[in-house]
Amino acid sequence: MEPTPMLRDRDHDDAPPTYEQAMGLCPTTVSTPPPPPPDCSPPPYRPPYCLVSSPSPRHTFDMDMMEMPATMHPTTGAYFDNGWKWTFALLVVAILGIIFLAVVFTVVINRDSANITTGTQASSG
């Protein structure tokens, strides 16, 4: 009967795999291939792999833009046609916000100064 792995003697344990074995690498030797015979035909042409495979979804827009002729690309200003509307709206909201804050601070300061003046007049009279 085979002893359980926990009870086996450490001397009989298998050695851990080497780095090459663990990574699935085999030792390779670098050597130049022999020159082809003079009557040998060249290998058949294979297109590059990037043209054979389909592009990933995130590059689809770039690919579509590349397929269009340069004269048909939208101008840079076309991407910002609605930008001036948002800029104007933001400017109006910012100005209204500044006016609102100025009115609120003015009312609060005037209310505090009115309470102080009425309080001093009431105590002296």
Curated annotation (Swiss-Prot):
Function: Plays a role in the inhibition of host innate immune response to promote latent infection. Mechanistically, suppresses viral DNA-triggered signaling by impairing DNA binding and oligomerization of CGAS. Also impairs the translocation of host STING1 from the endoplasmic reticulum to perinuclear punctate structures which is an essential step for its activation. Regulates the function of host NEDD4 family ubiquitin E3 ligases through its PPxY motif and thereby prevents the excessive ubiquitination of gB and its degradation by inhibiting these E3 ligases.
Pfam families: UL42
Protein name according to UniProt: Protein UL42
Region of interest (Disordered), residue spans: 1-47
Keyword Membrane applies: yes
BP-aspect Gene Ontology terms: symbiont-mediated suppression of host innate immune response
Family according to the record: Belongs to the Cytomegalovirus UL42 protein family.
Chain segments annotated as transmembrane: 89-109
Record note on quaternary structure: Interacts with host ITCH; this interaction induces the ubiquitination and subsequent degradation of ITCH. Interacts with host STING1. Interacts with CGAS.
Subcellular location: Host membrane; Host cytoplasm
A GO cellular component annotation in the UniProt record: membrane
Entry's free-text remark on domains: Late-budding domains (L domains) are short sequence motifs essential for viral particle budding. They recruit proteins of the host ESCRT machinery (Endosomal Sorting Complex Required for Transport) or ESCRT-associated proteins. Contains one L domain: a PPXY motif which is involved in the interaction with ITCH, a member of the NEDD4 family.
Motif PPXY motif: where in chain: 16-19, 42-45
Organism the protein comes from: Human cytomegalovirus (strain Merlin)
Keywords, ordered alphabetically: Host cytoplasm, Host membrane, Host-virus interaction, Inhibition of host innate immune response by virus, Membrane, Transmembrane, Transmembrane helix, Viral immunoevasion
Superkingdom, taxonomy of origin: Viruses
Location, primary (coarse class): host cell
Biased composition (Pro residues): 32-47
Membrane topology per record: Single-pass membrane protein
